[in-house]
A protein has these predicted regions:
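Membrane-interface helix-boundary motifs at transmembrane edges
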Residues: 5-9, 70-82, 146-156, 218-233, ...
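Functionally critical transmembrane alpha-helices in membrane proteins and complexes, commonly lining
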Residues: 10-69, 88-96, 126, 200
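Aromatic-anchored segments of alpha-helical transmembrane domains
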Residues: 21-28, 162-174, 239-252, 317-318
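Interfacial loop-to-helix transition and helix-capping segments at the boundaries
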Residues: 44-54, 121-135, 176-209, 245-282
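Transmembrane alpha-helical segments and their boundary/interface "anchor" motifs
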Residues: 47-55, 69-102, 114-128, 139, ...
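Hydrophobic alpha-helical segments with transmembrane-like composition
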Residues: 103-107, 115-178, 197-211
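C-terminal "closing" transmembrane helix and its immediate cytosolic amphipathic cap
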Residues: 150, 290-303, 319-378
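Alpha-helical transmembrane segments and terminal signal-anchor/GPI-anchor hydrophobic tails
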Residues: 222-301, 308
Length: 378
């Protein structure tokens, strides 16, 4: 792939950091919902305000792949897959094996039968956060298609793709007939697994946000000008999109009688308002972190979080597991203050783990290669 050296975009690193923070929030929120009477506002913080977190990772992944590139330049698909395999496939397999072994011991469930491993790996079911990497691998496998589309991409075509995306995601998430068909399939059949776990590997759920990241990367000078001229409007878009998703969440609970769990399973990132929020949050955060820069304490903090976000994303369930064991071992319920404290502890513990492992990896390069796909520069 031909490329020209472009200036580093610090906002992307910061977005990685805040996205990782959002993912931790979602997973702490899932545990907090075990509380028989959860605070619906804290649930909104953990599980609604963070809904941009997974889709925006696909945005920045595409941005990183296409920034400074030309989609019409010569492209070695083989070399691309080798590089991406080192960066994603190897860590995915390593962490999947780690969690299968760890959980077999920690939860006493035993190691799964060997015949079930292909299915576990295909669907990203070794641990709850790993499905993201499966979808990312599929995006990589289809890279020639994305390059072809981006070489011909226009804003009107991108708008059409957005409309198709909204329609497809709505069908996948909310179509009653389709979902009844899936749940009616016999347990243990391949077709049921392929459809039941569709959110774990169907790239079609996130094509628009991925292409948006690639399109902005290819037209970054124009996008940077737009951010400079319309920063306030981009902030407003982010706020309005969040307010709309929150309003729907509160309506579901306070008016329609949904439980908090039902509310977050409805007002999610694949709903029309969820997609609107993902777009609004993406553009607003890009503008915010571009303006924030790296010459202040907050900016530097997000750069550090972004630098270690990959390891934290992969490792944070370990911290959650043992913090929960401590909480339950002392006969405490996950109340709002404890949940917030647990969130901060998870973030700080995994940040420390990431820093230590990165340092060890500088002495033993294989550590970084296996855990985060980082090759030591000579």
């Amino acid at each position: 792939m031909s490329s020209s050296k472009r200036a580093r975009v610090s906002a992307v690193e910061a977005i990685r950091g805040i996205s990782m923070m959002g993912v931790i929030g979602i997973h702490i929120g899932a545990e907090y919902l075990a509380n028989p009477s959860p605070n619906i506002h804290l649930v909104a913080l953990f599980d609604i305000g963070t809904r941009f977190s997974v889709p925006i990772f696909f945005f920045i992944s595409a941005f990183g792949l296409l920034y400074g590139q030309s989609p019409t330049a010569p492209f070695s698909y083989r070399d691309f897959l080798v590089r991406r395999g080192r960066a994603v496939v190897i860590p995915y397999l390593v962490w999947s094996l780690f969690y299968l072994i760890h959980d077999a011991y920690a939860y006493g469930v035993g190691f799964p039968p060997l015949v079930s491993l292909p299915g576990i790996l295909f669907f990203g079911n070794a641990k709850y956060q790993l499905y993201f990497m499966v979808i990312l691998i599929w995006f990589y496998l289809l890279m020639p298609l994305w390059r072809m589309l981006l070489a011909r991409m226009t804003l009107p075509l991108l708008a059409v793709i957005l409309l198709v995306q909204i329609g497809f995601d709505y069908w996948s998430s909310f179509d009653t007939a389709f979902n009844l068909y899936v749940y009616g399939l016999p347990e243990g059949t391949l077709l049921r697994a392929l459809l039941f776990y569709r959110l774990n590997y169907w790239v079609m759920h996130y094509v628009f946000i991925f292409l948006l990241g690639g399109y902005i990367a290819l037209h970054f000078d124009a996008f940077r000008t737009l951010m400079a001229r319309h920063t306030t409007r981009l902030y407003a878009l982010g706020i309005v999109s969040l307010a709309a998703l929150l309003a729907w969440y509160y309506k579901l609970i306070l008016v329609d009688g949904y439980t908090p769990l039902e509310g977050i399973y409805t007002a999610h990132q694949l709903s029309p308002l969820g997609i609107f929020y993902t777009i609004g949050a993406t553009l607003a955060l890009f503008a915010f972190f571009t303006r924030l820069g790296t010459e202040n304490a907050l900016g530097r903090a997000f750069q550090v979080l972004g630098k270690h976000s990959y390891f934290i994303y992969l490792a944070h369930p370990v911290a959650i597991t043992y913090l929960l064991m401590m909480i339950h071992g002392t006969a405490h319920v996950l109340t709002a203050p404890i949940a917030l404290t647990m969130y901060m502890a998870t973030l700080l513990l995994t940040l420390c783990m990431a820093t230590v492992m990165r340092k060890i990896g500088e002495c033993v390069p294989m550590i970084n290669e296996l855990t985060i796909g980082a090759k030591t520069k000579k």
